[in-house]
């Protein structure tokens, strides 16, 4: 809805789930829903192409303000600057880190791998708190023979616990190998980001931070795509129409904010 996406005209992989399989310490809860899976590499490229914006790939090393403009590596100059580079965003690092420090207790760490795999079970599965994991693991089929598996948890609690994120990954993929993804081979990539906490300063002059650069992921499911989209739209409205840049309502809750959301927020943080 936020992206005005017409599913029928989307040209890439798009799979719809009518239920989630939620597993909590052996308890299996099939939950009716309407959820979708896409491949991010396809979806992000399609959104960028749809925007019609010119694209230049460049590794940012230096940002400075000069005469009402932002200068990036003496190669680019702009009146407005939006930091959408995730946790390590150079706009956040240069202009916002001291004004808007992140809370270590809200940091997550994740291991994930998306592979070509001829899956047989078409439903999304989520495992919460297995073996003391302060988070959850997932099995998400993608259309036409792709599969995303991953595991994530709260960084501080993992550091204080007996098992690392890699230990949890090994146990998780071993379980998958006996059930849902026999013979699959993984080479996971790791990344880190922050759940929503206080965001004291998200605009400085004509510079903005959005999405994971601002630390906006939901506190129940640690989901960042929705908050990234909504905060990006808020930044666009501020630039185009002079509206106040407000982030109070962009995060919300992945599960709707009811009892399940509140329990997961409490359990994860």
What are these regions (language model features)?
Residues 1, 24-46:
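Dinucleotide-binding Rossmann-like beta1-alpha1 core, especially the glycine-rich loop
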Residues 217-239:
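A conserved FAD-binding loop/helix module that cradles the flavin
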Residues 34-35, 160-163, 220-224:
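Short, solvent-exposed loop/turn segments at secondary-structure boundaries
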